[in-house]
Amino acid sequence: MLRIHKEGKIIIRNSLFILLLLNLALIGGVRMSKSVTTALGISSTLLGLWILYFFRNPTRLINKQEELILSPADGKVVAIKQIYEDEYFKEERIQISIFMSPFNVHVNRSPISGVLEYFKYHPGKYLVAFHPKSSTKNERTTAVVKRIDGIEVLFRQIAGFVARRIKFYPKVGDEVHQGDEVGFIKFGSRLDIFLPLNADIQVNLKEHVRGGKSIIAKIASEEEE
C-alpha cells in the first residue's frame, strides 16, 4: 500500500478536490468537443495520480554503520568538488550535490548519527536547482550533525524553481540517527552535503542514489586512523 508523507496531505486533499470539480464539470456537459473533454479528463486523472506518487514515503530498512555517510536524499549526483564552505566550517570541504527531480522521493534523511549542532534557515530566490548559484542564492537550510567521535557533516536543503517549501524537523541539540527522516522539500530541489577532505568518496557523477540506502562516503574515526 502506498504510504503518503504528512507534508502532502493538505496539498493532495485540495488538489484532488479541484480535479474532482473539473471532472464533474466535464461530465455535466461543459460545451467542449469530445476530444478536448477526453484529453482534459485523462490529464486531470494523471495529474492527480502524480501528486499522490510525489508524496509517497516508502519504508526503508537502514543499514546503520558509524563510518559510513549515507545519502541524505534520492536523486542524481550532479557535482563532486572541493570548495570553501564559508557558513560554518570556513575551510575547504568536499561538496557532493544531489539533484532531486519531481519524480524522486523528496524525504530527506540524516547521513550520520549524532547531535544536531547547527541549523539555519536562509530565505532566498528560486533559481533552477542545478544552477551553480542556487546553493548560495536560493531559499535553503543548513544543518550540521556531529558524530560521537567529533566528525561533523553539513548538509544543505536547497529549494529549486518549482520547490518553494522546505521543511526541517529536528532542533539544535536533538539527537538524530543515521537514516532518520529529518526533512522534506516540495516539488524538485537539491541537497548538498559537505564532507572532510579525508573522506573516501563512494559515488560518481551522474550516479543515482537513494536516501538512507546508498553509501556516499566513508569517514573513519580519528582513533581508527
Curated annotation (Swiss-Prot):
GO terms for molecular function: phosphatidylserine decarboxylase activity. The modification Pyruvic acid (Ser) is found at S189. It is found in: Cell membrane. The keyword Methyltransferase does not apply. GO terms for biological process: phosphatidylethanolamine biosynthetic process. It catalyses: a 1,2-diacyl-sn-glycero-3-phospho-L-serine + H(+) = a 1,2-diacyl-sn-glycero-3-phosphoethanolamine + CO2. GO terms for cellular component: plasma membrane. Pfam families: PS_Dcarbxylase. It is an enzyme of class 4 (lyase). Binds 1 pyruvoyl group covalently per subunit. Pathway: Phospholipid metabolism; phosphatidylethanolamine biosynthesis; phosphatidylethanolamine from CDP-diacylglycerol: step 2/2. It is a peripheral membrane protein. The active site is at S189. It comes from the Bacteria. Is synthesized initially as an inactive proenzyme. Formation of the active enzyme involves a self-maturation process in which the active site pyruvoyl group is generated from an internal serine residue via an autocatalytic post-translational modification. Two non-identical subunits are generated from the proenzyme in this reaction, and the pyruvate is formed at the N-terminus of the alpha chain, which is derived from the carboxyl end of the proenzyme. Keywords: Cell membrane, Decarboxylase, Lipid biosynthesis, Lipid metabolism, Lyase, Membrane, Phospholipid biosynthesis, Phospholipid metabolism, Pyruvate, Zymogen. Signal peptide: none annotated. Its cofactor is pyruvate. The record marks G188, S189 as: Cleavage (non-hydrolytic). Catalyzes the formation of phosphatidylethanolamine (PtdEtn) from phosphatidylserine (PtdSer). Heterodimer of a large membrane-associated beta subunit and a small pyruvoyl-containing alpha subunit. Belongs to the phosphatidylserine decarboxylase family. PSD-A subfamily. HAMAP family: PS_decarb_PSD_A. NCBIfam families: PRK05305.1-2, PRK05305.2-5. This is Phosphatidylserine decarboxylase proenzyme. It comes from Amoebophilus asiaticus (strain 5a2). The gene is psd.
